[in-house]
Design a protein with these regions (language model features):
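Short, Lys/Arg-rich flexible segments
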Residues: 1-172
Length: 172
C-alpha cells in the first residue's frame, strides 16, 4: 500500500499572508480613524491640519503596519511641550513665537520658530509687546499639555485589535 503526500504548504502560507495583510489594513485603519476621532475634541487649525495627515502603511513583505503623522507638531500634540511636556522633558520658562504670515493651511507649521529663548513671564510679555508694536502677530507660551490622541487610540483599541486577530486567524 502506497501513501500519497500532497503538499499544501504554499497554499496555507499564502492564505495566512493574505489574512495577515487584511488584518493589518483593518487594524491600522482603525488606529487612524480613532486617532482622528480623538483629535475631533480639539479645536483650531493646529489640530485640524494634523487630523488630515494621519495615515498608515502596510509592508506586505514584512507583514507589519506603521501608523503615523509626518507633521512635526503631531509629536508636540502627543507628548506636550515646554513646562507641560511628558516626563518633564520640555523647555522651561516662557517663550515668544510669531505666527507666520506666509503659511497656508496644510503646508506645515503656521508658526515661525528660530530656536527661541526662554524668558520669565514678564520678559516674554515685554518682548511680545515690542514685536506686536512692529506689526507682527506675536504670542507667548510656556507650552501645551500632551493631548495623546495616538496613545489614547492605541489604549482604547488594543483589546479590540487582539480580539480581531484571534478571530481572523482562528478561521484559518
Amino acid at each position: 500500500m502506497s501513501v500519497q503526500f500532497d503538499d499544501f504548504s504554499m497554499q496555507v502560507k499564502a492564505a495566512l499572508e493574505e489574512a495577515a495583510v487584511q488584518f493589518l489594513h483593518e487594524a491600522a485603519g482603525e488606529m487612524v480613524s480613532q486617532t482622528n476621532r480623538n483629535l475631533d475634541k480639539e479645536k483650531g487649525r493646529w489640530h485640524t491640519e494634523q487630523k488630515e495627515q494621519w495615515q498608515y502603511r502596510v509592508d506586505e513583505n514584512k507583514l507589519e503596519a506603521t501608523v503615523g503623522n509626518p507633521m512635526e507638531r503631531a509629536i508636540w500634540t502627543e507628548f506636550g511641550t515646554g513646562n507641560f511636556a511628558e516626563g518633564g522633558k520640555g523647555r522651561k520658562g516662557w517663550w515668544v513665537y510669531v505666527k507666520d504670515p506666509n503659511s497656508t493651511a496644510g503646508s506645515g507649521s503656521s508658526y515661525a520658530y528660530n530656536g527661541g529663548k526662554a524668558y520669565t513671564f514678564e520678559e516674554a510679555k515685554r518682548v511680545m509687546a515690542m514685536l506686536k508694536a512692529d506689526g507682527l502677530d506675536a504670542h507667548i507660551t510656556n507650552g501645551q499639555a500632551p493631548k495623546r490622541p495616538f496613545r489614547s487610540a492605541y489604549t482604547k483599541l488594543k483589546p479590540k485589535i487582539i480580539k480581531l486577530a484571534k478571530e481572523r486567524f482562528k478561521e484559518l
